[in-house]
C-alpha cells in the first residue's frame, strides 16, 4: 500500500469527529509527501506490518500517531501531550523529524510526552520547536516501566525553554557513539544515510528508499533495535531454587537475532544475589544468603555491547517459617491520644508482625474500615486517635 501526493477532497461538516482515515492489514505501507491533519485525534492509516511515513506533515492531539512505524523527514504539530497511545511492538522511530509543540506562552512548563501508556521510542537527528516564550518538558511517557528504554542521538532542543529527557533517568539511552546507531543511520563522507532498509527490509528486502545496495555493501543489515526479557518482574525465595532469566534481541520488524547479553544487579541488596552465566542470552539468579529475613527488591539490568538495554525487578522474599508463639493475648492500652498494642513472644524473634488497624461502628466489627497498616518489617504497634 502506498500514498504519494494524494489529496482527499474536503467535505465540511459542523460535527466534531475523529479523523480516522483508514485501517490496513497490509504487510507494507508507505506514505510520501502527505498531510495528515486533525485536531481531534488522528489515525493516519495504521495497522500494516511495516509502515514508513516519508516527508509528511501531521497535526494532532492525543492517541493520534501510528505507534509502530518509521517516520523520515516528517514534521509534527503537537497540540496536546500524548500523541501516541502506545508504541507497540518494537515501537516508533523518528529520523530527521521536527516537532512543533503548540502550547501557550503562559509561563507554565508543559509536559510533552510521546506516549500515553509506554513503548519504545527512538529519536534520531530530530529537533523541537515552540513559541518564543513556551516552556516544555519532553518526556517519554508519564509512568515508564522498569523495562522501558528509549534511544536518542543528535536531538536538539531550544536552549533554556525546553527540558530534554535526561540520560540519568534510566529510561534514556544516548547511542550517538554506540554501534547501535548503525541500525538507524550511517555517517559516510559527511553524508547521512538513514538505514530504513535495516528497519523495514524484512525477509523480502523491501527497499523503499532505494539505498539497500549501499546498506548491504556496508554490512549494516539485520541489526537488532530492541532487547526484551521474559518478564518485567521475577521472584526469588530465600532457601528456594534459582531462576533462569532469558533475553532476546529483535530487529525492528520483529525477527529474533542472536546477541550476547550481559546482566548485572543494582540496588541495596545486590550483593545478596549471584549471577551465573548460562549462555550468550541467559543467566541464572540465586541468593547467596538463605537467611534473609525481610522482603526487598533489586533491579536486574540487561545490555548488549552494541547499546541495547532493558531491565526488570527482582523481588526477594524471606524464607517462610512457622509463626512465633505469644506468651499471652495481645493487649491494647490507651496512652493519652494514642492506642498502643503490646505483646511478647515465647522466644526471642525478629518481629515481622503484620498489624492492621480497623475502625468499626460496633463490637461486632460490622462495616469495618482499614485505618492503618504496617510497612514491611515495621509492625504498626501505635495508633493515633
Annotate each language-model stretch with its function.
Residues 293-306, 380-385:
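A short beta-strand micro-motif common to beta-rich folds, especially ectodomain repeats
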Residues 257-261, 348-356:
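Solvent-exposed loop segments of extracellular immunoglobulin-like
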Residues 242-248, 336-345:
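A short beta-strand segment in extracellular, disulfide-stabilized domains
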Residues 223-231, 321-330:
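Proline-enriched interdomain boundary motifs that mark the N-terminal boundary
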Residues 264-282, 360-369, 373:
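Low-complexity "stalk/linker" and mucin-like segments enriched in Ser/Thr/Pro/Ala/Gly
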Residues 284-291, 369-385:
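Solvent-exposed segments in extracellular or luminal domains encompassing
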Residues 1-223:
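Sequence-level preference for short, compositionally simple segments enriched
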Residues 233-241, 331-337:
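Short, solvent-exposed loop/linker segments at the N-terminal edge
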